Amino acid sequence: MPVPRSAKISMSASPYKQLEQEFKRLHAFRGALALLRWDAAVMMPRGSADVRGEQLAALETEHHALLTAPRIIRLLDRAQANTQGLADWQIANLREMRRQRDHAIATPVTLVSRLTKAASRAEARWLEARAQGKFEAFVPYLEEVVHLVRDKAALLGQALNLAPYDALVDEFSPGLTTADIDAMFKALSRRLPALIREAIIAQEGRPFLPLNGKFPAGKQRALVVEVMKAVGFQFDRGRLDESEHPFTEGVPGDLRVTTRFDPDDVFTGLLGALHETGHAMYDLGLPQEWRDQPVGRDRGMALEESQSLLIEMMVCRSRPFVRYVQPLIARHFGTSGPEWEVENVYGHLTRVQRGLIRVDADELTYPLHIMLRYELEKQLLSGELAVRDLREAWNAGMEQRLGIRPSNDLEGCLQDIHWAGGSFGYFPSYALGAVIAAQLYESMRAELAGLDEQLARGEFSGLFGWLRTHVHGLGAKVPVQELLKSATGKPLSAASFVRYVEAKYLETTASSAAA
């Protein structure tokens, strides 16, 4: 764990200490930007999108100007020329400072401002297009974002000596490239299609009862808050709200989690909130001593998504968790009867079906949703696919991969906000996250005796203690591959994920009873 900065060698006038102060200011800007984005999705009137875009652009421009100032590069050069006396965390912090600066300097401030404003407009129009159910209303706004992201990718790639799309991936998942992504998808493609068929056939032999009931949003919120508190979310340093698309925003010490409630399905809101709580617990577990420095941030979105998917999919869709949450649901909603017995609820949560909506997809079909988005966003950025043709390409891709076709745009190309916000290169982090989560979970289960019994009692301290030691507490100190080798003994591999889903969905081993 990091040594307290106050206990280190005094360097009050050193280049390194001056850099710490500069990046502390930048951290404050990040927090302000995060809260403005949260407010835009949760509280802001839709007609205020242009005003909010101006506010975001002003702060982004100032953040960019601070990060790319000549003073920063001079201090970085001087600090990295003489690292004698610096601790390993400080040296890693310098590396992350340089990385942030290199990414920022590659993108002109005018492009940063234009993209921020365009993304703010596009996100607002995405909401309107969803309300109308018409992709056409969104097309010109997405076209503008794609054009600007294409320019950004070209500049980033040139500066970082990466292919344009790899440069975008590197922003979200540092150190990972399309080569890693393609290798992962190749391994998954060899097994998943057949496994999906096998799992569907297997579950046909054990039909389950529908989970009928009415679940008022107020009572759902009370349930979600109770479970989030048990998991360890600190409501004095964060809050829960509703939004069109669940997300987590903010900085450690001020985290905002959202979910969406379905009056006919208690698990939509619960699992959505717990997915986001996985993100929040990662952020809360980051090294407090470095929370305002680059090295104290998460190690990228692939690792971030591994934490959310580990909680939502592997922990919360397990028999031990069902044993814990079943009586809570009964207490909040008065549910009873055979449909609410543990095995039936577990069958509901692990049902495999070829569905249209990514956020509602099961573990087996989920990677196929990501493969589609990965291919489409690469084609959009390369110019191979025009935005106006996205709907048909999406629908054809769904039919090819899952054998189903959207009947409307809400089931298809309007279901995700990521591209509206300019987050191209993000989607692969979901599949990478699932693979990383399985790798970590396999090692965790081998080391933690009695984990299932703890989860069944609603005790999560052992699970998060392991994650804090092997993931959260490391911040951005080491690359993802090094972290995985240390935690699991091997680099990124899809093998653990395949073993996990085979055991869980085909019940191929005795240990799968704990799944």
Predicted regions mapped to residue ranges:
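Post-HExxH zinc-binding segment in Zn-dependent metallohydrolases
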Residues: 297-338
